[in-house]
Structures are given as structure tokens and as C-alpha cells.
């Protein structure tokens, strides 16, 4: 009997990607986040689709259409909170996934790593535009502040901002185009995720030890499938707990006030997952300098493979680098906290020191530490 799984042109691709895929036998739970991101993406597309059926992208009715979804649509409140908190879970998984890549040296697969960075930027853009759609106070002012950063670009800045806005301020045209982009981008993300997987399966997965695992591979199904399902159960449990018990925990109360262009909220801030970058932006007194620091805080990931000076791929057996990695994690948590605080003493100086430390760890301390560890390993 012919095995369709291995011969059918379409099923064969799925088989080689998710069933018979040779996988290192020693990959840990840190490798679960790729599949969790896939689950998050599917969940966001499905909940978003149902929200889009009832949402209207018009400044006059956007806020009330979201209220209508929560009050009048069957389980609309549940769909809305699953979508809003699903974004938070998405970013938690993203940060864990990138952190794992940094820790275990997965960035030495340059194609996979660079597609991953493009994915990260695309997801960030999608989330930002989604935050604007409910048309609350923080939606409006967040959109105004962040899009206004484009005006820091010399010569063409002002024209560029007005082009993005579709007028002389954030208004109906801006909301309509943001909704259009927010709808289409998840499908682009899906396509990019497939390319990400394509490049990953060219090389095979990395593993915690960082050494080639060709002699010791096992099929993806059933071993890692069952492991992924456990991860999905934990993800859904966390998401359900968040959406059902404290749906507004990670949101901003200001967004329950309809957008008012005539009065700005006392503290304009983005969603929690952008606060680290927002803190870096605010820590530099110069507008253009702040924007460049903001962009570089993410794009710094592109040069990480060039800064790898260690003879070992993974940090598993490099205690000094491990200390620096966890210092970087603590620094990012500090930046996240600072991003949500008002611009006053002592938060300004803490933010500046944390921003300097962030770039110093990645650009200076990690490469130097790796060189020191290389010399220590000769003893």
C-alpha cells in the first residue's frame, strides 16, 4: 500500500515539516515557543476575524462599535479580551523565543535569524496598529506620538508624517488605513513564518549543547508533538485565566475614555510589551537621537551573529556569559518598568543608565567575555 503521507505532493511537505522531521533528542522546553507562537498567531487571526465582522473603522463609531461588541454580540466580550490578552501572550512567547536564540547561539543560522527579526518587527507594527483601533484616549495619543517620531527624519520628516496620517492630524483616514494594515499583516506574518520554518529545516534545529546533533535525532511525531501540546495547554490556561479573571490587567484605563484630540492623558505610554523600547527612546534628550536609539534597540539583533567571538556556540558551558545574559534580562525588565513611569527624577537617570547598559552588554561586554572564556578554556 502506498503511504500517502510520504507520496502526496502537499501532504509530503506537512509530513517532512511536522511528522517525520528529524529533531535533536535533547531540545528542552525552551524550544516549545516556536509552536506556541504558531498557536498564538492562529488564535489572533480567528478572534480578529470575528471582531472585524462587528468593528467599524470610522472615528465617529469605532469606540462605540467596540462597546457594542462587548455588550451586544454573543460572547463578544470574550472574543475581544482573548484577542487583547492574546497579543500579550504572543509577545511573552516572542521574547522567550528570541531570548532562547540569544542564549543557545541559534543566531548562527543567519537566514532563519534574520527572517525572525523581520517577523518581530512585523508583529510589533501589527500590535501597534491594533492598539489604535478601539479609538480610546491612549489609542489616539499613542498613535499621534509614535507616528510623529517620523518627523525626526531630516528634510522629508514632516511630509512623511502627513503622508502616514492622510491629513494634518491623526484622524479618520489614519484609522481606516491602520485597520486595513492590521487586517492584512497577520497573513503576511503567516507567510514569513513559513519562510522562517523553510530556512530552519534547511539546517535542522539547534540544541542546548550547541554541538551538531546529526548522530542523535528522533522523529518530531510523537515525541515533540506531545511536548508541544503540553506547552499549548499551559499557554491556553494562562490566557484563559488572564482573559476571564483580570482582562484589563495589562491594558490602560485611559483607553476606556473615547479619543479626545483636545485633552492629552497625563502619561502617554504604549502597551507593556513596547515599554522597554519606549524607555530607550525617552532616555535620549534629542528627538532624532532617541528615534535612532529606538530603532537600533531592535535592529541590534541583526549584528549579534557578527559579535559572536566564542569558540562555543551555546552559553550552556559559559558561566560568565550566562551572568551577562541574565543581567541583560534584568536590564530589560528595568527598562519596561521605567517606560511606564512619568518623566521625572529619579526615573530619568535610571532609564538613561539602563539604556546605556543594554547597548554596552550586547556590543561590548558579551564579545569581550567570550574572548576571556576562550582563553580560560585552554587551561
UniProtKB/Swiss-Prot annotation:
It comes from Ailuropoda melanoleuca. It is found in: Mitochondrion inner membrane. It comes from the Eukaryota. This is Cytochrome b. PROSITE patterns: CYTB_CTER (PS51003), CYTB_NTER (PS51002). GO terms for biological process: mitochondrial electron transport, ubiquinol to cytochrome c. GO terms for cellular component: mitochondrial inner membrane; respiratory chain complex III. Binds 2 heme b groups non-covalently. One of its GO terms (molecular function) is ubiquinol-cytochrome-c reductase activity. Keywords: Electron transport, Heme, Iron, Membrane, Metal-binding, Mitochondrion, Mitochondrion inner membrane, Respiratory chain, Transmembrane, Transmembrane helix, Transport, Ubiquinone. Heme b b566 binds at residues 97, 196. Component of the ubiquinol-cytochrome c reductase complex (complex III or cytochrome b-c1 complex) that is part of the mitochondrial respiratory chain. The b-c1 complex mediates electron transfer from ubiquinol to cytochrome c. Contributes to the generation of a proton gradient across the mitochondrial membrane that is then used for ATP synthesis. The keyword Transferase does not apply.
Amino acid at each position: 500500500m502506498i503511504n500517502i503521507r510520504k507520496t502526496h505532493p502537499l501532504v509530503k511537505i506537512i509530513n517532512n515539516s511536522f511528522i517525520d522531521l528529524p529533531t535533536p533528542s535533547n531540545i528542552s522546553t525552551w524550544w516549545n515557543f516556536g509552536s506556541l507562537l504558531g498557536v498564538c498567531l492562529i488564535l489572533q487571526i480567528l478572534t480578529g476575524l470575528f471582531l472585524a465582522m462587528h468593528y467599524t473603522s470610522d472615528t465617529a463609531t469605532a469606540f462605540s462599535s467596540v462597546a457594542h461588541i462587548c455588550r451586544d454580540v454573543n460572547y463578544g466580550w470574550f472574543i475581544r479580551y482573548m484577542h487583547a490578552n492574546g497579543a500579550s501572550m504572543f509577545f511573552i512567547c516572542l521574547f522567550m523565543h528570541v531570548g532562547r536564540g540569544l542564549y543557545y547561539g541559534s543566531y548562527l543560522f543567519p537566514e532563519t535569524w534574520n527572517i525572525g527579526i523581520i517577523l518581530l518587527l512585523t508583529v510589533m507594527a501589527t500590535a501597534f496598529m491594533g492598539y489604535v483601533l478601539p479609538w480610546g484616549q491612549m489609542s489616539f495619543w499613542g498613535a499621534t506620538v509614535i507616528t510623529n517620531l517620523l518627523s525626526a527624519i531630516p528634510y522629508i520628516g514632516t511630509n512623511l508624517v502627513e503622508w502616514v496620517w492622510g491629513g494634518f492630524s491623526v484622524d479618520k483616514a489614519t484609522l481606516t488605513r491602520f485597520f486595513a494594515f492590521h487586517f492584512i499583516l497577520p497573513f503576511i506574518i503567516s507567510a514569513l513564518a513559513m519562510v522562517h520554518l523553510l530556512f530552519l529545516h534547511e539546517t535542522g534545529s539547534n540544541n542546548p549543547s550547541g554541538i551538531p546533533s546529526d548522530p542523535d535525532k528522533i522523529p518530531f511525531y510523537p515525541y515533540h508533538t506531545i511536548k508541544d501540546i503540553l506547552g499549548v495547554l499551559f499557554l491556553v490556561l494562562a490566557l484563559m485565566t488572564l482573559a476571564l479573571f483580570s482582562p484589563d490587567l495589562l491594558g490602560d484605563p485611559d483607553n476606556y475614555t473615547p479619543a479626545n484630540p483636545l485633552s492629552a492623558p497625563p502619561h502617554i505610554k504604549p502597551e507593556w510589551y513596547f515599554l522597554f523600547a519606549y524607555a530607550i527612546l525617552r532616555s535620549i534628550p534629542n528627538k532624532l537621537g532617541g528615534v535612532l536609539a529606538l530603532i537600533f534597540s531592535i535592529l541590534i539583533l541583526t549584528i549579534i551573529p557578527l559579535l559572536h567571538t566564542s569558540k562555543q556556540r551555546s552559553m550552556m558551558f559559559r558561566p560568565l556569559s550566562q551572568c551577562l545574559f541574565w543581567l541583560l534580562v534584568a536590564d530589560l525588565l528595568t527598562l519596561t518598568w521605567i517606560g511606564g513611569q512619568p518623566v521625572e527624577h529619579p526615573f530619568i537617570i535610571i532609564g538613561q543608565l539602563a539604556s546605556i547598559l543594554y547597548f554596552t552588554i550586547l556590543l561590548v561586554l558579551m564579545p569581550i567575555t567570550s574572548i576571556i572564556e576562550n582563553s580560560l578554556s585552554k587551561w
